Amino acid sequence: AASDVYKRQLNGRVVVIDCVTLWGTNFFFDNEGDTNRSLVELKEEFNKLTEQDAYLIFVTNEIGLGGVSPDAVQRRFTDLQGWLNQYIASRADEVVFMVSGIPMKVK
């Protein structure tokens, strides 16, 4: 896997994962652009992280709001990032979307 942060003892700690986009990029390229395999592995690692009794903060990028790239690899990665963001947000207690430094509470 592209990361093994979940193997660390995180109980009782505040942990910032910055940045989810780079984290996803590592899995995407380790898996040679296979979005399905990358997403499965990212979800597995996320689930292992959230099993610990830690306060987790995930910082990510919303890269799907712009135009659609003509490049197939970029489109696949944009999809992967969107699916990963949705997965994390669905399991988060709180989601804040930052726009120009202004927090907008989503959840």
Where are these predicted regions, by residue range?
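Short, small-residue-biased leader/transition segments that mark boundaries at the very start
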Residues: 1-6
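A basic- and aromatic-enriched beta-loop-alpha substructure that forms the phosphate/nucleotide-
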Residues: 7-28
